[in-house]
């Protein structure tokens, strides 16, 4: 097989198919079901998911919670408006941030937010233009202040404001730290999860804090030259054991979302099995890379030329993936973060 090029993953997407708001109710989104056995494509609704699961299967979800990490403030003493997007915690109250306007936020710049009970000072400018910023606040934790003043960092292609911040949060989100939602999980409702469990299907949790690198376009023509961003993950002993037991019993491990998938595949590649651990991963799954853990995947429809569509092609096959996307456009599926879902089994 020739070295794959970025342009191999291009497809034409009419703008109107980019979903601007989530389906309501959540599980009323559509579900394209792709069979690895017979290459069939079925068109279903997300709440039909349990019909495709078998007793003994294990769904693995990412319980990371999105930080309302976009905060707009006022530069002191000039009064100029500026914006910070918290990307990751460096240490204590120091965070790596994306700053706008970056050029005007030199080291030593002080910014105040809301009623002034949250302030920030720029400590350092990094090579890529990001800033190290230290925050000062009057509450127990910075998170309380972000809840008060922050907004969800929606992807750039979503232009509509959310009616409710929780729309960009999965119903099982609990570990704060993501800059973007693990979107495949947005389709689940508590009732659907009950139905799945009642069928004898397990649901286990991992944590991977989604970085904004997930939206970073691939710059290189040859995809193998692309350098992946790094993200923090954690797998508990309980989850690791459930995954090992599922595999040993000959049942399927189905990742909900590319983030859960990357967590499991990173750990399986590193240790040869799934074990309890935490760390950072920059695993890049593209056609030709072998999968060592997952048997299936629930995911959304991803951007052309993104590392995520490359991951789908790695799992399902390049030609079949590009064909499925062509069908999705013809059938007017809704795309990207608030869009419809795909199940590969």
Q: What residue ranges belong to the model's regions?
A:
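Surface-exposed, charge/polar-rich loops and edge strands
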Residues: 2-345
């Amino acid at each position: 097989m020739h070295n794959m090029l970025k342009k191999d993953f291009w497809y034409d997407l009419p703008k109107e198919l980019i979903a601007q708001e989530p389906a309501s109710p959540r599980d009323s989104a559509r579900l394209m079901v792709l069979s690895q056995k017979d290459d069939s494509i079925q068109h279903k609704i997300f709440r039909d998911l349990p019909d495709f699961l078998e007793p003994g299967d294990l769904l693995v979800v990412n319980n990371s919670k999105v930080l309302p990490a976009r905060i707009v403030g006022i530069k002191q003493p000039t009064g100029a408006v500026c914006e910070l997007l918290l990307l990751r915690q460096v240490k204590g109250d120091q965070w790596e941030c994306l700053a706008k306007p970056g050029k005007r936020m030199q080291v030593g710049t002080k910014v105040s937010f809301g009623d002034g009970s949250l302030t920030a000072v720029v400590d350092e400018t990094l090579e890529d233009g990001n800033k190290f910023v230290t925050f000062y606040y009057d509450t127990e934790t910075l998170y309380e202040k972000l809840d008060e003043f922050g907004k969800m960092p929606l992807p750039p292609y979503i232009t509509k404001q959310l009616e409710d911040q929780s729309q960009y949060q999965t119903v099982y989100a609990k570990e704060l730290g993501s800059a973007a939602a693990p979107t495949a999980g947005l389709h689940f409702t508590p009732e659907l999860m009950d139905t799945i469990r009642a069928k004898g299907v397990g649901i286990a949790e991992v944590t991977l804090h989604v970085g904004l690198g997930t939206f970073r376009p691939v710059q290189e023509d040859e995809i193998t030259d692309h350098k992946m961003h790094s993200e923090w993950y954690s797998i508990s002993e309980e989850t690791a054991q459930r995954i090992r037991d599922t595999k040993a019993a000959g049942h399927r491990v189905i990742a909900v979302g590319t983030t859960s998938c990357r967590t499991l595949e990173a750990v399986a590649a590193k240790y040869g099995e799934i074990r309890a651990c935490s760390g950072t991963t920059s695993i890049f799954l593209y056609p030709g890379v072998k999968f060592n853990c997952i048997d299936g995947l629930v995911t959304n429809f991803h951007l052309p030329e993104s590392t995520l569509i490359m991951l789908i092609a790695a799992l399902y096959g390049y030609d079949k993936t590009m064909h499925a996307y062509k069908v999705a456009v013809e059938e007017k599926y809704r795309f990207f973060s608030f869009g419809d879902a795909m199940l590969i089994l």
